[in-house]
Curated annotation (Swiss-Prot):
Function: RNA-binding component of the eukaryotic translation initiation factor 3 (eIF-3) complex, which is involved in protein synthesis of a specialized repertoire of mRNAs and, together with other initiation factors, stimulates binding of mRNA and methionyl-tRNAi to the 40S ribosome. The eIF-3 complex specifically targets and initiates translation of a subset of mRNAs involved in cell proliferation. This subunit can bind 18S rRNA.
Organism: Mycosarcoma maydis
Organism taxonomic ancestry: Eukaryota, Fungi, Dikarya, Basidiomycota, Ustilaginomycotina
Domain (RRM) ranges: 225-303
Protein name: Eukaryotic translation initiation factor 3 subunit G
Principal subcellular localization: cytoplasm
Subcellular location: Cytoplasm
GO cellular component entries: eukaryotic 43S preinitiation complex; eukaryotic 48S preinitiation complex; eukaryotic translation initiation factor 3 complex, eIF3e; eukaryotic translation initiation factor 3 complex, eIF3m; multi-eIF complex
Lineage top rank: taxon: Eukaryota
Record Gene3D superfamilies: 3.30.70.330
Record-stated family: Belongs to the eIF-3 subunit G family.
Alphabetical keyword list: Cytoplasm, Initiation factor, Phosphoprotein, Protein biosynthesis, RNA-binding
């Protein structure tokens, strides 16, 4: 078997062997792009670029760039923090956040209200009127029924009676009973039938002029067992005192002395009970008790004639 001869390699005239990669032709690189710049003023710069496209044609690209200086006002403390030297993993890094150690979130706008109080929405006048009409019940002036007076089924009968329905207007609360005080033997009713004026003392079955309007069970305001509470705070109101004293017995009346101009409590109040034993027990428990960071004083209220 004949030996296989080694492939022959061509050598240049200098005697140095040639690499096989040198046999391929090097790609022809086109002309390098030529760039021209000129300034047109007002911050406008024109950049002209001459280059060769893939088809071998020379093209001209013109760009106009306008530079505008935008000034932004930042907080002095924020600008000062940007000049701090970085430390830790960011030590030696350039200014500004780095994506490897810093995550930038969305900007949250914080709106501070004056006094941390939310402004209550203003209610329209029409809405106020609708609310008032929604809670108002229609009451007939004649029979006190839940219908208009013009549609009353007893209109022909009750209109013949003088004074019927004169006490409660249409749309009132209807708390009075029908035909209250319409006794024909009453002199006030007989006088009103003739179109004469009837004084308040003679209305509603009153016995005569000078009669004092009685309170609970015929008792006047001075006859009720009343306590005088002093050293109250400026924020005290009727509901607070009623809640404080109602645990000792039934509270008939609560009066808090207030300033006429400001409406602030003057520091005293009167509480009337139905039962004197309940009032005495409340006096012993409340007198000297701490309430709203103050020590209350609770004593019996003297009648007007016995006050010093």
């Amino acid at each position: 078997m004949a030996p296989v001869a080694a492939p022959s390699t061509s050598q240049p005239a200098g005697g140095k062997p040639m690499n096989w990669a040198d046999e391929f032709d090097e790609p022809v690189v086109g002309d390098a792009p030529r760039i021209e710049e000129r300034d047109e003023g007002n911050g406008v710069k024109v950049v002209i670029e001459y280059r060769t496209n893939p088809d071998g044609k020379k093209i001209k690209i013109t760009r106009r760039v306008k530079r505008t200086l935008v000034k932004t006002k930042v907080n002095h403390e924020v600008a000062e923090r940007k000049t701090w030297t970085k430390f830790g993993q960011e030590k030696g890094k350039a200014a500004g956040p780095h994506s490897a150690t810093t995550t930038i979130g969305e900007n949250v706008v914080l709106k501070m209200s004056a006094g941390n109080k939310t402004a209550e929405p203003e209610v329209d006048d029409m809405d106020k009127m609708r609310q008032q009409l929604a809670n108002k019940r229609i009451v007939c002036r004649l029979c006190k029924g839940d219908h208009f007076t013009t549609k009353c089924p007893y209109k022909d009968t009750l209109e013949a009676i003088p004074g019927a329905g004169a006490d409660t207007p249409e749309g009132g609360d209807g708390s009075m009973t029908p035909l209250a005080g319409m006794d024909p033997t009453n002199p006030a009713v007989a006088a009103s039938a003739g179109g004469k004026y009837v004084p308040p003392s003679m209305r509603g079955g009153a016995k005569g002029p000078g009669e004092k309007m009685g309170g609970l069970g015929g008792m006047s305001r001075d006859d009720l067992p009343t306590l005088r509470v002093t050293n109250l705070s400026e924020d005290a109101d009727d509901d607070d005192l009623r809640e404080l004293f109602m645990r000792f017995g039934r509270v008939v009346r609560v009066y808090v002395g207030r300033d006429r101009e400001t409406g602030i409590c003057k520091g005293y109040a009167f509480v009337s009970f139905e039962n004197r034993e309940d009032a005495d027990r409340a006096r012993q428990k409340v007198d000297g008790r701490g309430y709203d960071n103050l020590i209350l004083s609770c004593q019996w209220s003297l009648p007007r004639g016995e006050r010093p």
